Amino acid sequence: MSISDNSREELGELPAGRPLQSEFNDDLDYPRLGSVTFRRGTLTENQQTMWNEKWPELGRVLEDELIDIDAWFGRTGAKTIVEIGSGTGTSTAAMAPLEADTNIIAVELYKPGLAKLMGAVVRGGIDNIRMVRGDGIEVLNRMFADGSLDGVRIFFPDPWPKARHNKRRIIQSGPLNLIAKKLKPGGVLHVATDHADYAEWINELVEVEPLLEYKGWPWPECPQLTDRQVITKFEGKGLDKDHTINEYLWQKKQ
């Protein structure tokens, strides 16, 4: 049964209240959102007009149905990369024109962030970006078949800095295993953070998933674009505080 219905009166809206969460029974650690609900926000009048016109073509919301990637993008055989937590889409929109042969699917909870990305897509005539509104773990688990993705990107995820909230971090054993299952052999996971404690956390996990081979950073032979092209809003804030950007690359074993 579908969690969402894109035909609802307000396009791209998610159910109110606490989001549904999958039950994982593999003894791995998965983030739990706890009291966090789907982030809501107000669009400008122009953004709302654009959203109403373009969302049926460019967007979907979290649902229990696998995405037919070829049908959605109107082409077959193209590589597909999912970006989890795309924010306002600064990197997404900057990278996509340089990888026109690749389908880019941006996953984000925050509606104004997706609207901003949609504006960049429309203004720039970018035709290889689509959007899914929902929690990244649930979207991966419910909407993509195993072995269907060429890449997953997670740029500057929420660090959940308080120790009692560390279990909500997306980079941990469970998500790494889930991502590995969704990647094709040879597929790439690219993570970036400017949070020192989160970087230490990730450093302890780089070898935890047996399906992934850690390649470090940089990895000149990486088969995908790794230059994020621009400094994102959150990256800029970190650099202003003299934070170090740490990046990580893994490849699914053949």
Curated annotation (Swiss-Prot):
Annotated PROSITE patterns: SAM_MT_TRMB
Binding residues annotated for S-adenosyl-L-methionine, in chain numbering: 83, 108, 135, 158
Active site, per annotation: 158
One of the record's GO cellular component terms: tRNA methyltransferase complex
Listed transmembrane segments: none
Comp. bias intervals (Basic and acidic residues): 1-11
Root EC class: transferase
CDD domains per record: AdoMet_MTases (cd02440)
Key word Transferase present: yes
Pathway as given in its UniProt record: tRNA modification; N(7)-methylguanine-tRNA biosynthesis
Residues annotated to bind substrate: 162, 194, 232-235
Molecular-function GO terms, alphabetical: tRNA (guanine(46)-N7)-methyltransferase activity
Reaction equation(s) it catalyzes: guanosine(46) in tRNA + S-adenosyl-L-methionine = N(7)-methylguanosine(46) in tRNA + S-adenosyl-L-homocysteine
Family per record: Belongs to the class I-like SAM-binding methyltransferase superfamily. TrmB family.
Function: Catalyzes the formation of N(7)-methylguanine at position 46 (m7G46) in tRNA.
Name recorded for this polypeptide: tRNA (guanine-N(7)-)-methyltransferase
Source organism: Corynebacterium efficiens (strain DSM 44549 / YS-314 / AJ 12310 / JCM 11189 / NBRC 100395)
Lineage, uppermost ranks: Bacteria, Bacillati, Actinomycetota, Actinomycetes, Mycobacteriales
